[in-house]
Amino acid sequence: MSVYHAAYIDYALRVTENMTDVMTGSETVTLKSYQHFVSRVFLGLDKMHSLLLFHETGVGKTITTVFILKHLKDVYTNWIIILLVKKALVEDPWTYAITKYAPEILKDCIFITYDDKNFHNKFFTNIKTISSRTRLCIIIDECHNFISKSIIKEDGKQRPTKSVYNYLSKNVALHHHKLICLSATPIVNSVKEFVMLVNLLRPKILSNVSLFENKRLVNESELINKLGAICSYIVTNEFSIFDDVAGSSAFARKTVYFQYVNMTQKQEQVYQKAKLAELKAGISSFRIYRRMAATFTFDAFLDKTDKTPEEVANEQITLYKDFETFIKTKKFSEHALSQFKRGQSLGGTSSADDISFLNELRERSCKFTDVCLRILASPGKCLVFEPFVNQSGINILLLYFSAFNISYIEFSSRTKNTRVQSVAEFNKRENTDGDLIKTCVFSLSGGEGISFFSINDIFILDMTWNEASLRQIIGRAIRLNSHVLTPEHRRYVNVHFIVARLSNGDATVDEDLLDIIRTKSKEFTQLFKVFKHTSIEWIYEHQTDFSPVDNESGWSALISRSIDENPTTKRVPHVVKGQNIWYSHSNRLIAVYKGFKTDDGRLFDSDGNFIQTIQDNPVIKIHNDKLVYVLD
């Protein structure tokens, strides 16, 4: 049925044939061809009420959206633009971009922050003041966050944001409004987010039944058939975050490293106490105590049993101040720092004080110590991701930076008033090599809405619960032309996953979280494929045999067809001959997977999903006594 969608895309392009690709305000910008294409389709089809911009970080989805907003009055006279964004993104990029390229629409814009506790009240207060003769254009930036806040909790209680979600899904198409959702990672935590996003864009088209059976999408073709033109898909990096990616003239090369560091005996003892405390408290599934213990340990485990929050807070402050005092009384010699910068260990020519200080730092945190040494040895600027701010997180990490004489900025929840300016200083041309500011340490606050330039090394100190968050974090440093000022031999980004290990070989919390991320990503990859094949770009390129249309009268009926989640066509199992093998997408064997290769060369993963056909004379390497096929 995508051939019919192609006819309407063609119609939109004919209607907007003379639309300029230049946007001028106080400054002028010329849109890239893919930005102009999206804009023409969305503006050329007045009845296209909604569109997802599934664009990877750095390709300019904000500029694309501002261009569309600037040209809304080409379609209709009276518009009010409602931008639903995170508070941190109101000023930059949104107000900044609109003021720069479309200042005339600023008076028609209403910013409402969906991370405000009174968000739903502010939204409906504004809605009541808008004339019924006025059309709305609603922008939802980082829409995965909005969707996440709209999901009903496990206790069945509806979250306030859900009332806004319900209003939009009911009224956008009904009252001839327009909706644009933006995200580089539209699915983050669960498949339910996909269902909710689809039903926001195409109301009631998808029911809440399971889309998967044994981790395989039940009816991919039906979804692709009915969801045609639901999104614009600009994603050049479709690799897993764990895969190496070759560079290009516009993008830096990415290489992934797993840095396994062994906990010290002291750290292991505290880690085991943390594990026991989680079991007693019934919070072992969150792994919070173990995550903190694997990162940093004080001289003793902070047991919260039978203590008031105030007592716990006071004890934490005391432990922190004791460690801070210890750091301030110590200092590495210039000789030691010079060795660290050359990537060398302390040896026979090193002083006893330097060796003792390094051992004491490592005893409390194998991860922080390892990262500091790698930062000093890096030839350029570095990013360090640490999700925890207080306790054993950024608070302590900055003391380690002080000990190793590492210059830094901090982008976290506690630096809201200064962090935007700090990033601007960090990104300055004169700091391309990190001579002025070596490192930016950031929490989850740094995952969205910001860009970093000329980064050479990223250190992931603690895992998030999903690949999407990590992808966004990495994507902030590998963007279109992000390394244009960097010397050619340094146009690369090394991504280091810092993984703590136990001496007895038991899996640590770091290794557990890696497994969780990989399991989730299998289902998400299949849903992202649906978005790709239903995108306006894919349809326009692949569906060329269509009969042109002269109006858009049939568009609404085309996109309103409900999806049959119980198809009559079922998969018929076939028995094939072959063998179990190991395979990897990386020549460096970063991640090795178990699969099945048929006698005719087809490769399937452990869940039965087809991967690719293995060519004659494949590359095979030996890894941990296994023969591993290296895929092209």
Swiss-Prot record:
Residues 457-524 are annotated as: Binding to the cap-specific mRNA (nucleoside-2'-O-)-methyltransferase. It catalyses: a ribonucleoside 5'-triphosphate + H2O = a ribonucleoside 5'-diphosphate + phosphate + H(+). Transmembrane segments: none annotated. It is found in: Virion. It comes from the Viruses. Signal peptide: none annotated. One of its GO terms (cellular component) is virion component. A motif (DEXH box) lies at residues 141-144. ATP binds at H55, E56, T57, G58, V59, G60, K61, T62. One of its GO terms (molecular function) is ATP binding. Residues 42-204 form the Helicase ATP-binding domain. PROSITE patterns: HELICASE_ATP_BIND_1, HELICASE_CTER. Its EC number is 3.6.1.15. InterPro entries: Helicase_ATP-bd, Helicase_C-like, NPHI_C, P-loop_NTPase, SNF2_N. Pfam families: Helicase_C, NPHI_C, SNF2-rel_dom. GO terms for biological process: DNA-templated transcription. Residues 367-532 form the Helicase C-terminal domain. Belongs to the helicase family. NPH I subfamily. Monomer. Interacts (via C-terminus) with RAP94 (via N-terminus). Interacts with the cap-specific mRNA (nucleoside-2'-O-)-methyltransferase. DNA-dependent ATPase required for providing the needed energy to achieve the termination of early transcripts. Acts in concert with the RAP94 subunit of the virion RNA polymerase and the capping enzyme/VTF to catalyze release of UUUUUNU-containing nascent RNA from the elongation complex. NPH-I must bind ssDNA in order to exhibit ATPase activity. This is Nucleoside triphosphatase I. It comes from Myxoma virus (strain Lausanne). The gene is NPH1.
